[in-house]
Every structure is written in C-alpha cells, then in structure tokens.
C-alpha cells in the first residue's frame, strides 16, 4: 500500500513539474515584451522627429511667428519622449533578461528533478532486486536444509 501511495505522489510531482514547465516556456507570455519594445521604438522615432523639428526652428530654417516658443515645446516634448524611450528600453531589457533567467532556472530545475527521479527509480529497482535475491537465497537455503 505504501508503494502505491509513493508512486501516486511521484506521479503528481511529475504532472506538477510538467505543468510548471509548460507555463514557463509558453511563448505567449513574451507578448507584453514585444508590445513594450514596439512602444519604445515608436517613442524613440517620435522623439527624434520632434528634436529635429525643434532644431530646425531654432536655426531659422523653418519660419514660424512663435518659433522660440514652438522650438522650446518641441525640445521639451522630444527630450521627454527620448528619456521615456530610454527608460522603457532599459526596463524591457531587464524584463527580458529576468524572463530568460527564470526559464533557464526552470529548465535546470526540471533536469535536476528528472535526474533525481531516475536515481530514485534505480535505487528502488535495486532494492526490489535485492529483496527478491534475499527471498530467493532464503528459499534455496530452506530447500537445501530439508
């Protein structure tokens, strides 16, 4: 009875391990990272465009009645977007690195569990073989004694 109970617990652990592994390696979890990278790219492009326009306003290439105010606004918004894009890029890189580390740790843990399960199985098989050998020796010695 104990052997059956231990076997069912081992099967539950295997099922839990497989579910965790599938959840960690699911590529749909990486979708927010792609969206964040797209937002960072758009913000960077917009910031560079605003900074170029502001530079053209300041240099006088583009004429506007309120060129200094418009140029200051473009510089401010462009710098804000560029800073936001920089911070967003750093945070996205950090999130991707953390996710990859988590995946590699999960894979290593899964490999360790599989190796441990194989060793446990070999040990239980060896102990079962030893018990059957002992029984066989006992039965042979009893037959030899009679």
Swiss-Prot record:
It is found in: Secreted; Host vacuole, Host pathogen-containing vacuole, Host pathogen-containing vacuole membrane. InterPro entries: IncD. The keyword Nucleotidyltransferase does not apply. It is a multi-pass membrane protein. It comes from the Bacteria. Pfam families: IncD (PF17628). Coiled coil: none annotated. The chain crosses the membrane at residues 38-58, 68-88. Keywords: Host membrane, Membrane, Secreted, Transmembrane, Transmembrane helix, Virulence. GO terms for cellular component: extracellular region; host cell membrane; pathogen-containing vacuole membrane. Induction: Cotranscribed with incE, incF and incG within 2 hours after internalization. Host inclusion membrane protein probably involved in early modification events of the chlamydial inclusion. This is Inclusion membrane protein D. It comes from Chlamydia trachomatis serovar L2 (strain ATCC VR-902B / DSM 19102 / 434/Bu).
């Amino acid at each position: 009875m104990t052997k059956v109970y231990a076997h069912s617990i081992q099967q539950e652990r295997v099922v839990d391990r497989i579910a965790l592994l599938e959840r960690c390696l699911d590529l749909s979890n990486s979708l927010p990272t792609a969206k964040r990278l797209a937002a960072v790219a758009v913000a960077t492009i917009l910031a560079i465009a605003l900074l170029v326009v502001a530079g053209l306003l300041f240099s006088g290439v583009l004429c506007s009645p309120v060129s200094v105010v418009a140029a200051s606004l473009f510089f401010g918004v462009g710098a804000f977007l560029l800073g936001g894009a920089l911070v967003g890029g750093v945070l996205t890189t950090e999130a991707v690195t953390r996710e990859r580390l988590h995946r590699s740790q999960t894979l290593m843990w899964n490999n360790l569990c599989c190796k441990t399960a194989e060793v446990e199985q070999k040990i239980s098989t060896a102990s079962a073989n030893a018990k059957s050998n002992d029984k066989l020796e006992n039965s042979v010695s009893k037959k030899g004694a009679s």
